[in-house]
Amino acid sequence: VYFGEYLLMVTPMFWAWVGQTMFFNRFGEKIKLPELYMLPQMFFLILMTASFDLTFSNTYYTFLIGYLGIRIITVIQYFVISRQLRGNPRRVAILLGSVFLLGVITTATSVFFDGSVRYLVMYLGIAIDIVLPLFLSKTLQKVPVDFPHLAERFGLFVIIT
């Protein structure tokens, strides 16, 4: 039971980390004042971490606020950077921002449900974030990620968790 709840909490945290890492991997050098985005995300990450509880349903709303805060800021970053870009990089930024916005909206609707349905809806939003970009790989390959950097970031996350 506790392992299942642990996975319920760690998976969104992992995905928030992945989303931010992927953004900075592709566009981090181009964004102005990245700390304006990172500092609020750190606050939301602290909120998520403080929401870890053996009875996850007791802290679900604060956890969700933390998760959505991080993801909304990431979506904003994609749309902000898209205004500075041209061609394929612009298309990729708008595409990812739009897909992730759909995931955020879906996850946010989990507040209207209780019990297992709540978690199902939350994970449906995360699944949208993960699966839809897989169908867009031809477009995304036009602005590739730096895989050695990603491997280092994933290794760091594993060590931390």
Language-model-detected regions and their locations in the chain:
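Multi-pass alpha-helical transmembrane bundle typical of ion/small-solute transporters
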Residues: 1-161
